[in-house]
């Protein structure tokens, strides 16, 4: 495992959570073991992502329409590539107005 790449992914997910969470908002970072896998998650309580964009946000250069936060649209695509190169998955669970949870999952 390339720990630097996984650290980069976590830093990117945390940075996104900070940018999309209102001032004094809450962000949760955690890990849990599920049967034969380990999950690391970053959860925010920001504006959330419309479900129709849940797959597209992992595409290079994609930006959710109306997003005001600066960015290149590369962070999540690169994060997904790094995680998948290590045999894992990166997914999102999000609803508009309720925030987002990004989950990195590795089989153990």
Regions from the PLM with identified roles:
Residues 44:
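Acidic ATP/Mg2+-coordinating residue in the GHKL
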